[in-house]
A protein has these predicted regions:
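N-terminal secretion-targeting helices of virulence/extracellular proteins
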Residues: 1-182, 714-715
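Non-catalytic all-alpha helical scaffold/repeat segments
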Residues: 186-712
Length: 715
């Protein structure tokens, strides 16, 4: 059943004239057959013939046979007319859909071309910037990796939708033409109905296979066929609801428990583990689609999934029995689940954990060897997937609006103190709940806590409104009050951890700060820490903790650099010298955070290897890119900063302890030059006054550095 995805070239070259002709021909055919069937317009017709044959007084040896033949023939005329109507509906809908797909692709191609992006024949996005000679004196920006990824994602979406139209139409037409001597009058009326029927038929088939066989014995080929069905039907509610509700809540959980880890030395590995990883993700997406269906059957399924969270599910012949929460959370790793379901499910996990007592230890419950089945195959080699909070938080990160609501959700007041501060889920997740290394629940493991890594992605989604797993290009600093509140709340909670700041959250917190770079810059450059947009002490402490990881620090500085340049280009009242001084002040602040991070870890034996600079990586798509006019200054500043950072690394991270900003003189110079480019008429931009400009921005950096150092010393 493997289906080929259409290429950009194939969709572009698709000629719809023949299809339009077929629609016209079938319109004529359908009208004629309908006339013969019902007699519209008068004349001989099957409906009249059937009525007369039924009412007639037949006699003779073959009377019964003849009556049946005539009435059956008359009925078949009606079926033929109905089938013709179905064919017409499929062809008409397909034609309209393909025209829409072609127009959508053309729109995307034309749109991304404005960003100097070319879409190749296969649908890939590549930079298309003319050479220096061809460009002349024009300053043509090269598209970023994030812009290329977004462009390619847009094209793939169109191609996937076009391929789905092709698949659904072809399957429906084949079904209608299956028997040349028999006709059906109840065919689908169009593409949408055909999609629904096909989805339900596939769901019935696979639900029956699950019930009538042992999924742990399925061959790799059969699992891959199921994968292909899940991919084809991933956004089809007809399939997803039917499959989930036919299996039922317990049946769904038991299926994954059986196929994921049958035990007895049969725990999947190698190629089968990879196939199961794909199945886990595809089934997650299908269940996510189902969660949005508003029907009594689906409501029952969701309630029963939650009710079964505290049940244990075994497998024949083995003692290991994981909880329903553990199984279901591993089927929530992909797709956007319904917000109401996520809220109810997350509350149920927390209630279950609380029922284990005030001294609840997640590792002792979820990591217990007696329930330690292998349920997660999404990572390299997979992880046990024992902490249900990991899969749940992945699902939260894929629904950013819900993520924001979750982190700000108030918890019941169980304190006797009337003045006790209001607790939220942010308090619970970032400060109260314990996490553990699923690979080694009762040992040291590799030091990475998978569920806390998922927590970082959920926090990032909550504070930015973006899905961390979807390419994006952010072009402004417009954030909702709720997203700002998530940032404020998380800053306070994580700053309180000081050097116990979770390493898994460094890159995500760096991305969150970069996404709110305007507020970070305003706060870091504040003359009065009490008036800063963000809490000055909290920002400094979190910036320090983020800076303990080279890549996270690089990402943070990408965001700060963008924000500084954007501030220089933004309209302001008063002397623009303020933006020059603020730039220096922020650089001094960030260098203080960086120095204290280095000083904290200087005795770590793994310290030298830890700091090789690799760049900020894929999460740069959270950094706002505010207009092409800024890009030259952004690039110049980033280049100067990176060169100085590399030199610092080569010099074993040497830094002037008293004046940390001194290692940033080239960066300060680049910022000063960009400021003069924006303000050519200012006296500090006059020829010969470069020294004065450099002195001003350097003194501002010194002031920012001293203020930050003093704050660190007092905390």
């Amino acid at each position: 059943m493997a289906t080929k995805t259409m290429t950009a070239q194939e969709l572009t070259d698709l000629r719809l004239g023949t299809l339009d002709t077929a629609v016209t021909d079938w319109e004529t055919m359908s009208k004629r057959l309908k006339t013969l069937s019902t007699g519209e317009g008068g004349g001989v017709n099957a409906q009249r013939l059937r009525a007369e044959a039924t009412a007639a007084d037949w006699s003779g040896v073959n009377a019964g046979v003849t009556r049946d033949f005539v009435t059956k023939t008359a009925a078949e005329f009606q079926d033929v007319a109905g089938q013709a109507t179905s064919v017409l509906g499929i062809l008409r809908d397909a034609g309209a859909a393909f025209k829409r797909h072609k127009a959508d692709l053309r729109t995307v191609i034309d749109d991304v071309a404005k960003r100097n992006i070319y879409i190749n024949a296969k649908g890939g996005a590549v930079a298309s910037v003319p050479s220096g000679a061809a460009a002349g004196s024009g300053d043509i920006p090269t598209p970023s990796d994030e812009e290329l990824a977004v462009a390619e994602s847009r094209v793939k979406r169109v191609l996937r939708e076009a391929s789905e139209t092709d698949r659904i139409a072809a399957r429906a037409l084949r079904a209608l033409a299956r028997n040349k001597h028999d006709f059906t009058g109840d065919g689908p009326g169009g593409i949408k109905e055909a999609d629904d029927r096909q989805g339900k038929a596939d769901a019935d088939y696979w639900a029956r296979r699950v019930k009538e066989s042992d999924p742990s014995e399925w061959s790799a080929e059969e699992i891959e066929r199921f994968n292909e069905t899940l991919i084809a039907q991933r956004d089809n509610p007809g399939f997803s609801e039917r499959f989930a509700t036919t299996l039922g809540a317990d049946g769904t959980l038991q299926f994954w428990r059986d196929i994921a880890d049958p035990g007895q030395g049969k725990t999947p590995e190698g190629e089968r583990a990879k196939i199961l990883g794909r199945l886990q993700q595809n089934l997650s997406m299908s269940l996510a689609t189902a969660s949005h269906v508003d029907s009594p059957a689906m409501d029952t399924w969701k309630r029963e999934i939650i009710a079964s969270g505290g049940k244990q599910f075994g497998h024949e012949g083995i003692m290991v029995k994981p909880y329903g929460f553990q199984i279901m959370s591993n089927l929530m790793v992909k797709g956007k689940f319904d917000s109401g379901f996520l809220d109810d499910y997350g509350s149920a996990i927390r209630t279950f954990e609380q029922s284990k007592g005030s001294q609840f230890n997640p590792a002792a419950v979820w990591g217990n060897p007696g329930i330690a089945a292998k349920l997660d195959y999404t990572g390299e080699g997979g992880t046990p997937g024992s902490d249900p909070m990991a899969g749940y938080l992945k699902a939260v990160s894929h629904n950013p609006d819900f993520a924001t609501d979750l982190f700000l959700k108030r918890l019941p007041d169980d304190s006797d103190d009337p003045n006790a501060p209001t607790r939220t889920m942010a308090d619970y997740l970032l400060s109260e709940r314990e996490f553990y290394d699923e690979d080694d629940p009762f040992g040291e493991g590799d030091g990475t806590m998978q569920s806390r890594d998922a927590l970082g992605k959920a926090l990032l989604a909550a504070g930015t409104g973006l899905n961390p797993d979807v390419p994006a290009v952010v072009t402004d600093y417009d954030r909702t009050p709720e997203q700002r509140e998530v940032l404020d709340k998380s800053l306070g909670l994580l700053a309180g951890k000081k050097d116990d700041f979770p390493p898994e959250l460094r890159d995500d917190m760096a991305a969150l700060l970069a996404n709110h770079g305007d507020k970070v810059h305003q706060s870091a450059s504040s003359l009065n820490s009490g008036d800063s947009a963000l809490d000055y002490k909290d920002l400094l402490q979190v910036s320090k903790q983020v800076s303990r990881d080279q890549d996270a620090y690089g990402l943070l500085m990408e965001g700060v650099n963008q924000a500084i340049i954007a501030d220089m280009h933004a309209p302001h009242e008063g002397d623009p010298k303020e933006e020059l001084l603020r730039a220096g002040q922020t650089v001094g602040f960030m260098e203080s955070a960086r120095y204290h991070a280095l000083d904290t870890d200087k005795d770590d034996p793994s310290w030298p290897a830890k700091w090789a600079y690799h760049g900020a990586g894929g999460v740069v798509n959270f950094v706002p890119v505010v207009g092409d006019a800024l890009q030259r200054g952004v690039d110049a500043g980033a280049y100067a900063w990176q060169m100085e950072e590399q030199a610092r690394i080569d010099d074993e991270l040497a830094i002037d302890k008293s004046q940390n900003f001194q290692s940033r003189q080239a960066y300060l110079t680049a910022l000063g030059e960009e400021w003069s480019r924006v303000n050519p008429g200012h006296k500090l931009s006059a020829d010969g006054d470069e020294y004065l400009r450099q002195m001003d921005i350097s003194l501002a950096a010194l002031n920012g550095n001293k203020s930050a150092n003093g704050t660190v010393g007092s905390s």
